[in-house]
């Protein structure tokens, strides 16, 4: 019989996908899931997690989610995870008295970063994928239904890069990378031609930004984000240095 103290916990977290060997626990001891499970198991919290979304190798996340059943306080668990795992940050949680299937979300938001300002042609090509379509030709074949709905596509434009935001309840394997790859290489109607995954965009610019649930509000966990700030500052300086290199070459 389960303890009365046993609670159901959703944890929202992010990770730098380039630092891990894929996501799924079966792929490697250094996969995202494996690293989390190893720490939770070491501290006798749990030996299993249920993930809301699986990302491709080298794809990062800012708001993925996993579920565990536990008797420990959420703050203690997030403190353990943040203190023992590099290149991940565990920032929010939701506690419930009953089971929550983490995959039953209402919306996922992905961001794809393009390192330049895109023109209207590329925007139009990407916008063609809005709505409900059969994405068989824009995904890696697996057992899942290839019909998916993209509810919204937004473009965030900055001085020297563009962020494409995709909103949808669920996506199939390689779908968004295939969309970006096709849109960059072809002006044809993507659903009127025979095409299969010929142009797969790079995984590193893709980020699972957030997963949203109906009637669930995550509680923010206060943690020391000095590592993230320091990493950002060092990478920002490095990017400026290489920008100077490029300008000196172009002169």
Curated annotation (Swiss-Prot):
- Active site residues according to the UniProt entry: 56 (nucleophile)
Determine the domain of life of the protein's source.
Answer: Archaea
Q: Which GO terms describe its biological process?
A: tRNA pseudouridine synthesis
Q: In its keyword annotation, does this UniProt entry include tRNA processing?
A: yes
Which of this chain's residues are annotated to bind substrate? 110
Keyword Aminoacyl-tRNA synthetase listed = no
Q: Which residues form a coiled coil?
A: none
Q: What class of enzyme is it?
A: isomerase
The Swiss-Prot or TrEMBL record annotates one GO molecular function as:
RNA binding
Q: What is its EC number?
A: 5.4.99.12
Q: Which UniProt keywords apply?
A: Isomerase, tRNA processing
Against InterPro entries, the record matches this protein to: PsdUridine_synth_cat_dom_sf (IPR020103), PsdUridine_synth_TruA (IPR001406), PsdUridine_synth_TruA_a/b_dom (IPR020097), PsdUridine_synth_TruA_C (IPR020095)
Q: Which Pfam families match?
A: PseudoU_synth_1
Task: Say what the protein does.
Answer: Formation of pseudouridine at positions 38, 39 and 40 in the anticodon stem and loop of transfer RNAs.
The similarity annotation says: Belongs to the tRNA pseudouridine synthase TruA family.
Q: Which PANTHER family match?
A: PSEUDOURIDYLATE SYNTHASE (PTHR11142), TRNA PSEUDOURIDINE SYNTHASE-LIKE 1 (PTHR11142:SF0)
What is the name attached to this protein's record? Answer: tRNA pseudouridine synthase A
Q: Which organism is it from?
A: Picrophilus torridus (strain ATCC 700027 / DSM 9790 / JCM 10055 / NBRC 100828 / KAW 2/3)
């Amino acid at each position: 019989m389960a303890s009365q103290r046993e609670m159901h916990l959703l944890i929202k977290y992010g990770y730098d996908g380039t630092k891990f060997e894929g996501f799924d626990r079966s792929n490697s001891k250094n996969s995202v899931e494996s690293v989390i499970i190893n720490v939770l198991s070491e501290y006798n919290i749990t030996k299993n997690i249920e993930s809301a979304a699986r990302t491709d190798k080298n794809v990062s996340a800012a708001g993925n989610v996993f579920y565990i059943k536990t008797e420990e306080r959420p703050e203690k668990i997030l403190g353990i995870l943040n203190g023992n795992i590099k290149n991940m940050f565990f920032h929010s949680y939701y506690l419930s008295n009953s089971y929550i299937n983490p995959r039953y979300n209402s919306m996922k938001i992905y961001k794809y970063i393009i390192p330049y300002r895109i023109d209207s042609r590329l925007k139009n090509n990407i916008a063609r994928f809005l709505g409900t379509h059969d994405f068989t030709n824009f995904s890696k074949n697996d057992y899942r239904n290839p019909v998916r709905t993209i509810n919204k596509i937004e473009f965030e434009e900055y001085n020297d890069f563009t962020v494409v935001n995709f909103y949808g309840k669920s996506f199939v394997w390689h779908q968004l990378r295939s969309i970006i790859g096709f849109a960059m290489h072809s002006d044809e109607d993507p659903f009127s031609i025979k095409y299969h995954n010929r142009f797969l965009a790079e995984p590193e610019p893709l980020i699972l930004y957030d997963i949203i649930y109906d009637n669930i509000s995550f509680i923010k966990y206060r943690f020391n984000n000095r590592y993230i700030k320091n990493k950002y500052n060092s990478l920002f300086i490095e990017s400026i240095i290489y920008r100077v290199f490029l300008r000196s070459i172009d002169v």
